[in-house]
Amino acid sequence: MDVSNENANSSIMTMEANFFMCIIVVFTQVRPVNNPESSAYLFSGFCRHTHKNACFFSFDFFQLVFDASSFAIPATLFYKYTKVTNINMKNITKNQIRMILLSSYLLSLIVGVIYVITYEPDESLEVASETRKFHSTQYDFRYYADITGYQKHFWSWLATNLNMISIFVPPIMSIVFIRLIQIKLNSLKHLFTDKTAAQAKKFDLALTIQTLVPAVCVIPIYIAHLILENYDLPFLSNFEKVLYMMLSLPTAIDAFIVIVTITPYQKAFIAFFKDTFCGKKVSPAIVRRNNISAVSIF
């Protein structure tokens, strides 16, 4: 009886250990090494510069999501620009929809294809075997780059530079689109009522936040990351956690900004719940002045 209880307790403890290890893996980007001679950990940060197949891990999937979401913001601004340039437009054209979707997800699809065609699980075992000859008890990937040479590999170079495009290009695109939108709105001021003008200011503020938050969160943090990872600094693994959070922040707050500050999104959001629970619909706001119909874009 005692033996069965001990086995049950041992099984529960093992399950708890595995559960907490999964939590650690997901939230700290760390995983244990399957090596009886060592209890060290592999940090995905330096692993990315060593051999992708040895660390095809959560950062890679996170990067794919970020590649898509980072271009989604300027794609949204492009849609807003098309609305501003044609205030009587009721529906966006199919070609514009295709362009928005393509510009949002093309880069992440390319990087994803690179990951798929270059991923070979057996190579991770070969890397572990080769590096164990030189560092039998110390599994810090900073020591492995010279052995594998993957940092200079074409696929590594291509994926790294494509990911850098997703860091630096979208904020620049967003700034260009928001400036074009502001210029167009200024040219339409004579059509605005007082209420519409107030909505335009709120709309402009929302677009500014959408543009500045990614630029402030992403570019300085990522540049600091690129600089710091060239040095052997003990806090770098913790700094990478900050990097992940800062990279995800624009995406996390983008939907909130849109719903709170842009009227049609508010109406659509409220209408969704009214349709769901009350069966009522909210009609779109239309501004009419000087015999010109302008569907509210704010």
Curated annotation (Swiss-Prot):
Compartment annotation: Membrane
Record flagged with keyword Membrane: yes
Membrane disposition: Multi-pass membrane protein
Transmembrane segments: 10-30, 54-74, 99-119, 158-178, 207-227, 242-262
UniProt main location, coarse: membrane
Pfam families the record matches: 7TM_GPCR_Srd
Keywords of the record: Membrane, Transmembrane, Transmembrane helix
Keyword Ribonucleoprotein: no
Gene Ontology cellular component terms for the protein in this record: membrane
Positions in coiled-coil regions: none
Record-stated family: Belongs to the nematode receptor-like protein srd family.
Family matches, as PANTHER family: SERPENTINE RECEPTOR CLASS DELTA-34 (PTHR22945:SF8), SERPENTINE RECEPTOR, CLASS D DELTA (PTHR22945)
Listed name of the protein: Serpentine receptor class delta-34
Lineage: Eukaryota, Metazoa, Ecdysozoa, Nematoda, Chromadorea
